[in-house]
Regions:
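Short, charged recognition helix plus adjacent turn
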Residues: 74-107
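A short, Lys/Arg-rich alpha-helix, primarily the initiator
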Residues: 2-26
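Short, basic-rich loop-to-helix N-cap that marks the start of a DNA-contacting helix
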Residues: 52-65
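Residue-level signal for the short linker/turn that defines the boundary of a DNA-recognition helix
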Residues: 18, 28-30, 55
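The alpha-helix within a helix-turn-helix
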Residues: 24, 35, 64
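Short alpha-helical DNA-recognition segment
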Residues: 28-46
Length: 107
């Protein structure tokens, strides 16, 4: 059964695929060249450029690596503004995370 994605996620994947294609074309690389260098099939490259959700993140990273853009993935969620606000609010409220049980180990 195919996974149902949120519309925004589908749009983001589609834009991501378009960006991959544009980056490939700017480098004057064919799908076949990228596929060979990434160790993927041409049909997988085509699916990624269409923003397919069925392609593994590892394959997307291989594609990015061939384009010299693989480190850009590290920027994702690096500045988690909402998460930091939630963490700060928890610290201000004085609540602490529950203690972990010591499972017979000594420090």
């Amino acid at each position: 059964m195919r996974q149902k994605l949120f519309p925004r996620v589908e749009r983001n994947l589609s834009v991501f695929g378009e960006n991959l294609k544009a980056a490939r074309l700017r480098r004057k690389l064919s799908m076949e060249q990228v596929a060979e260098r990434a160790g993927l099939s041409r049909s997988t490259i085509s699916a990624m450029e269409r923003g397919s959700a069925s392609v593994s993140i590892g394959s997307y990273l291989q594609f990015l690596f061939v384009l010299g853009l693989d480190e850009d993935i590290l920027k994702m969620a690096a500045d988690d503004i909402l998460g930091r606000k939630l963490q700060d609010a928890e610290l201000l409220s004085g609540r602490r995370a529950p203690k972990r049980k010591n499972r017979g180990r000594t420090a």
